[in-house]
Swiss-Prot record:
Plays a role in the degradation of histone mRNAs, the only eukaryotic mRNAs that are not polyadenylated. Probably also part of an LSm subunits-containing complex involved in the general process of mRNA degradation. It is found in: Cytoplasm; Cytoplasm, P-body. This is U6 snRNA-associated Sm-like protein LSm1. It comes from Bos taurus. PANTHER family: LSM1, U6 SNRNA-ASSOCIATED SM-LIKE PROTEIN LSM1. Keywords: Cytoplasm, mRNA processing, mRNA splicing, Phosphoprotein, Ribonucleoprotein, RNA-binding. GO terms for cellular component: Lsm1-7-Pat1 complex; nucleus; P-body; ribonucleoprotein complex. The keyword Ubl conjugation does not apply. GO terms for biological process: deadenylation-dependent decapping of nuclear-transcribed mRNA; histone mRNA catabolic process; mRNA processing; negative regulation of neuron differentiation; neuron differentiation; RNA splicing; stem cell population maintenance. The keyword Oxidoreductase does not apply. InterPro entries: Lsm1, LSM_dom_sf, PTHR15588, Sm, Sm_dom_euk/arc.
Length: 133
């Protein structure tokens, strides 16, 4: 097999369906249409997939340009196995509400953790409270 270095290896994956995981945690699924030397991607017929528990919802995004430095993971989707998922698809409104509830629960748990540490005389410095020297 002949392997090309760097992002040139993605040329073989153009026009195939891919899953892209971004640095901010979002998951995109779409057809890879273009790449460049910086791994910037152009995805077509893109959907943003939101997972909460055993449910997921897809938000249509259309054509999506992704800056290469924001890509954490890029993988081709096997079209034959794509429908064999144990997850249940729900409406956009339902998955967004479940995501909001999950985020609120995590935030409350983090507040309890910080308070417990504070009660013990410990603290974790937060990024927004640190000053640059």
């Amino acid at each position: 097999m002949n392997y090309m270095p760097g992002t040139a290896s993605l040329i073989e994956d153009i026009d195939k369906k891919h899953l892209v995981l971004l640095r901010d945690g979002r998951t995109l699924i779409g057809f890879l249409r273009s790449i460049d030397q910086f791994a910037n991607l152009v995805l077509h017929q893109t959907v943003e997939r939101i997972h909460v528990g055993k449910k997921y919802g897809d938000i249509p995004r259309g054509i999506f340009v992704v800056r290469g430095e924001n890509v954490v993971l890029l993988g081709e989707i096997d079209l034959e196995k794509e429908s064999d998922t144990p997850l249940q698809q729900v409406s956009i409104e339902e998955i967004l509400e479940e995501q909001r509830v999950e985020q609120q629960t995590k935030l409350e748990a983090e507040k309890l953790k910080v308070q417990a540490l504070k009660d013990r005389g410990l603290s974790i410095p937060r990024a927004d409270t640190l000053e640059e020297y």
